[in-house]
Amino acid sequence: MHLARIELTNFKNYEEVALDFSPGFNCFVGNNGVGKTNILDAVHYLSLTKSFFNNSDSLSIRYGEDYFILKGMFEKDGVEDELFCAFQKQKQKVFKLNGKEYPRMSDHVGRYPVVMLSPADSMLITGGSEERRRFLNRIISQYDPVYLKAHMCYNKALMQRNRVIREGGPDTDSMLEIYDEQMAPEAEIIFRARQTLTENLKPLFSSYYEKISGRAEQVSIRYRSHLGGEDYIAQLASSRSRDHAMQFTTLGIHRDDLVFEIDGHNAKTAASQGQQKSFIVALKLAKFRLISMMNGFAPALLLDDIFDKFDHNRVEEIIRLVGS
């Protein structure tokens, strides 16, 4: 897979720019603030239909304008595909493949996979559990359309369940039973996929961490879930009184987490800044490797200012790993 060309119009700080890329490595060099990261985010948009950095498309529109347009030319197995993404304020985002609009954005996810490594990834360790769930989702969704559909259906039912809890009424419990039955099979799909991913990710991650850090500390990833083989509908029923008190669904697959440990301690508190940085780079390289294995071809790997706080030896090792 190869991104041959990209065009940006009114995207972030760019009024208009077109870039041609060569196969292999492409490097952007320039002062801070000139827009290097924005080009990477445009590639992320064309791959996953959304920004890496924020959930609002409006934030990607150039100041003073009311729309942006992205175009890209991807090559895979000797076939060229032209991608088109446009967003205008107060309107729906449009995404096209070879001139034909997708009925659903999710239909595009996984066609041209991508892995982004950015300083913002520090939130994987220091942030809340939603950051780590997003990490899981962005991996599995790029090779498993069944998971992506299950995740979307689960979230839709969850939003409706939470609305019923907030609004109350005499039929609340019967309505909750309906949504519980809708959520349970989707939760099972999500749980199994995340569990399998974590097990497959562990050896890749440990190997990359050892090579990058050059140290012998033990690192681990552990998947923590409310499901764990128990009856999901029964769990939801048993938590209803707490749900009513808190005014939202307090238990479920949407509360899952990844636990990152170093020498048996939580990496959030026990790891130094350098160790956390090595942890994140190893995670993302493991993600890159796993998606490559699942899809049979390598995704685009976007590296955004990742060498800060690394010594010369670690920088050389990361470059070697990426090059291999």
Task: Name each model feature, range by range.
Residues 1-31, 171-185, 189-302, 309-324:
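Conserved NTPase motor "head" modules and their coupling/switch loops across ABC/AAA+ ATPases, GTPases
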Residues 36:
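Conserved lysine of the Walker
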Residues 44:
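Helix-to-loop junction immediately C-terminal to a conserved catalytic motif
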Residues 47, 143-144, 165, 187-194:
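Short amphipathic alpha-helical interaction patches enriched in hydrophobic/aromatic residues
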Residues 47-131, 140-143, 147, 202-207, ...:
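Nucleotide-state sensing region of NTPase/ATPase domains
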Residues 60-63, 154, 194:
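Intracellular alpha-helical coupling/juxtamembrane segments of multi-pass membrane proteins
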Residues 123-125, 130-177, 181:
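Long, charged N-terminal accessory/stalk domains
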